[in-house]
């Protein structure tokens, strides 16, 4: 998007700025830049300090723990792609202490076949939805039930496949990241049966919320206007 728009903005000789919403730290760097542009540096720094304090406390939860290997599937209607650490969802998992099995790239998303995914052997598979979450969750359920290769993944065998709440795990950074990190905590670092049960309950609730979103119906209504 930036590569397309930047030459146009430069051509009309106007003030412009692009926000980095691919990660939480990127969002706060953008906030600092906006504070400088609009002479609101104190307010911007206050937000940055709040994030720094929050994240310093959050990191202490998982100090010294082994980082689980995680694969993130970003679902689209009819297909899915791999989310890398350069995407917002990937950055959240990284902030939470997960090790993304597709980290050796500068791309946000990758198209990869399941055979290659199997070679990565993730401990955990996370499923997120971008656009029409009601369709995406049904697609994931169907594919994992009917595509035999999934049954050979350790994450599937061990019951460590989780759906993520679509409002928290989208394409762009938002101030809902604390809720996202809280959701990831029992998924990535279950320390008790209670944590494991909470992770499954959260995943089930994410599925239900996606199914109840009526996103497809709302989209079709908009298209018909």
Regions found by a protein language model. Give the residues of each.
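Acidic/His-rich segments in extracytoplasmic proteins that coordinate ligands and/or metal ions
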Residues: 1-37, 112-152, 186
């Amino acid at each position: 998007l930036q590569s397309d728009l930047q030459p146009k903005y430069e051509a009309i000789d106007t003030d412009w700025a692009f926000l980095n919403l691919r990660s939480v730290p990127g969002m706060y760097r953008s906030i600092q830049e906006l504070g400088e542009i609009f002479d609101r540096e104190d307010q911007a720094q206050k937000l940055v300090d709040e994030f720094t304090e929050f994240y310093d406390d959050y990191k202490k939860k998982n100090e010294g723990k082994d980082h689980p290997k995680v694969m993130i599937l970003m679902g689209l209607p009819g297909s899915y792609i791999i989310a890398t650490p350069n995407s917002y969802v990937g950055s959240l998992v990284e902030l939470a202490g997960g090790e993304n099995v597709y980290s050796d790239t500068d791309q946000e998303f990758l198209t990869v076949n399941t055979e290659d995914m199997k070679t990565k052997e993730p401990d955990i598979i996370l499923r997120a939805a971008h656009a029409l979450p009601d369709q995406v969750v049904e697609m994931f359920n169907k594919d994992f039930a009917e595509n035999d290769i999934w049954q050979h993944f350790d994450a599937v065998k061990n019951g460590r496949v989780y759906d993520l709440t679509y409002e928290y795990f989208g394409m762009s950074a938002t101030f809902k990241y604390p809720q996202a990190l809280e959701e990831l905590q029992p998924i990535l670092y279950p320390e008790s049966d209670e944590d494991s049960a909470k992770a499954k309950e959260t995943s089930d609730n994410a599925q239900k919320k996606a199914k109840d979103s009526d996103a497809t119906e709302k989209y079709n209504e908009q298209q018909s206007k």
